[in-house]
Design a protein with these regions (language model features):
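Histidine/cysteine-enriched polar flanking segments
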Residues: 1-240
Length: 240
């Protein structure tokens, strides 16, 4: 069976491959130079992926990702919005898929993503948090987030929610990163964290919330949880 394809921050690609390479192929991200440097290599700032082999990509990195991902059978769609350096111009592609819904701050969202979702009948919910994808880990019908607006919208949609403390996640160049940016689905029943969950004050609660839903956890011992712009699956070998 074909393994999943992931895009991961090029600055951490070797560490990510060492930690999670057994789960699939890890492709280094293409830096998007219109974004601020700390997030310029974050996949979730320039890509929207449905994990079923369609990726909507920001114009500045479209050709680079076409070369990187086309050999794996990934379909690339060029977006219309070039992400800016500052918030909220930088979050056009930052859309969270969770439990069959899509969550984002839709004003300023990439129109190709909106069109993609509407054609598939996926219900969109507005949240105040522009970094929707970064701010939440979604798996099955469950969401883990520190953001109140995402937690509220997800709960109102019937999803199971664990709300955690903000912070406690490294993102060099900023005060802190987000739980979604430090994690991702690795296979049909495994959630990965780039760092050690034991170092997070809610680590035990996070692990229990995940395992109670029949998923296992794969983290990186002794490493601080680090926001790498999501362990972004762009093509899966299973139904998501």
């Amino acid at each position: 069976m074909n393994q999943p394809i992931f895009v991961a921050d090029c600055r951490y690609i070797e560490a990510l491959r060492e930690a999670f390479g057994r789960f699939g192929t890890f492709v280094p991200s293409a830096p998007c130079k219109t974004l601020a440097e700390p997030e310029s290599c974050h996949p979730d700032m320039a890509l929207y992926a449905d994990a079923e082999s369609t990726v909507i990509c920001a114009p500045p990195v479209y050709e680079a990702y076409r070369r990187l991902l086309s050999p794996f059978g990934v379909t690339l769609v060029q977006g219309k919005i070039t992400p800016g350096r500052d918030y909220p111009e930088n979050v056009a592609y930052n859309v969270l898929n969770a439990g069959g819904f899509a969550f984002a701050k839709w004003a300023g969202a990439e129109p190709q993503i909106v069109d993609f979702l509407e054609k598939r009948g996926i219900v969109r919910h507005h949240v105040a948090q522009g970094y929707a994808r970064c701010s939440a880990l979604a798996f099955a019908d469950s969401v883990i987030t520190a953001d109140p607006s995402i937690a509220r919208a997800a709960a109102d949609s019937g999803l199971s929610v664990l709300q955690i403390e903000p912070g406690h996640i490294c993102l060099p160049g900023y005060d802190y990163g987000f739980i979604g940016g430090a994690s991702g689905l690795l296979d049909a029943r495994t959630v990965g964290f780039f760092g050690d969950l034991r170092l997070h004050p809610n680590g035990d609660a996070i692990r229990s919330f995940i395992t109670a839903r029949g998923f296992s956890v794969c983290d990186v011992p002794h490493r601080p949880l680090t926001d790498v712009g999501t362990i972004l699956m762009v093509k899966s070998s299973f139904s998501v």
